[in-house]
């Protein structure tokens, strides 16, 4: 987990290993497939807060340089480094390809699919992260177990058998999935006094 201390779980406890992450079975399979095929150019697509950057970091074995497009000009990039570039949606084709040539592995993060904007000979494999996060019982069990671990880690007291607690976890999933950032934020908001405070459902 990250060493910085902001008081925000979503920042302070950002996973630094795959084992610490909330991955669906579909995400695990896709990650293994991408790693097995040793793909060097990947675009990860999805809405805000669902974990695109974390998935990209896992793909780069947490060794990638994470940059926003605005930081490119002032950041030296070693050719051997993996670069994870955020905010790529508005970049023109030529700029995307120029960026790709600056690193051994290039992972682009976008909110929309940009694969059709890149030259066929330099195409990026697109991964739609939301498609790997189905809203089903398996995904619910994954997020529930992840949140129980987060609560334990933060020494938050809760009664796992309490009906309201169970309903609150289900409600977080129903209303916010697949926005992992918001799920963790809302979990922290319900645990401010050191114990879980259920909101009647």
What does each of the following model-derived ranges do?
Residues 1-38, 61-62:
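A short, basic N-terminal segment
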Residues 37-55:
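Walker A/P-loop nucleotide-binding motif
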Residues 60-70:
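Post-Walker A helix-loop "phosphate-sensing" segment adjacent to the P-loop in P-loop NTPases
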Residues 68-95, 100:
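Conserved P-loop NTPase "ATPase switch" module shared by AAA+ and STAND
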Residues 84-86, 105-112:
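Structural recognition of the conserved hydrophobic beta-strand(s) that form the central parallel beta-sheet
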Residues 113-126:
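Short regulatory helix/loop adjacent to the ATP-binding pocket of P-loop NTPases
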Residues 127-167:
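Conserved small helical "lid"/interfacial subdomain of P-loop NTPases
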Residues 165-166, 174-188:
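The conserved phosphate-sensing helix
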């Amino acid at each position: 987990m990250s060493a910085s201390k902001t008081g925000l779980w979503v920042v302070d406890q950002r996973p630094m290993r795959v084992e610490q992450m909330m991955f669906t079975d579909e995400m695990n399979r896709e990650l293994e497939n991408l790693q097995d095929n040793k793909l060097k150019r990947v675009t990860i697509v999805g809405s805000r807060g669902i974990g695109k950057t974390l998935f990209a970091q896992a793909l780069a074995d947490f060794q990638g340089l994470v940059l926003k497009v605005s930081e490119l000009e002032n950041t030296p990039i070693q050719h051997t480094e993996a670069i994870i570039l955020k905010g790529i949606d508005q970049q023109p084709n030529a700029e995307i390809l120029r960026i790709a040539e600056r690193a051994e592995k290039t992972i682009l993060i976008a909110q929309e699919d940009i694969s059709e904007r890149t030259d066929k000979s330099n195409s990026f494999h697109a991964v739609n992260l939301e498609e790997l996060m189905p809203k089903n019982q398996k995904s619910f069990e994954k997020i529930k177990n992840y949140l129980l671990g987060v609560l334990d880690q933060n020494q938050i007291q809760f009664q796992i058998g309490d009906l309201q607690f169970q309903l609150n976890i289900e409600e977080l999933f129903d209303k916010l999935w697949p926005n992992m950032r918001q799920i963790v934020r809302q979990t922290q908001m319900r645990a401010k006094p050191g114990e879980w405070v259920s909101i009647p459902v």
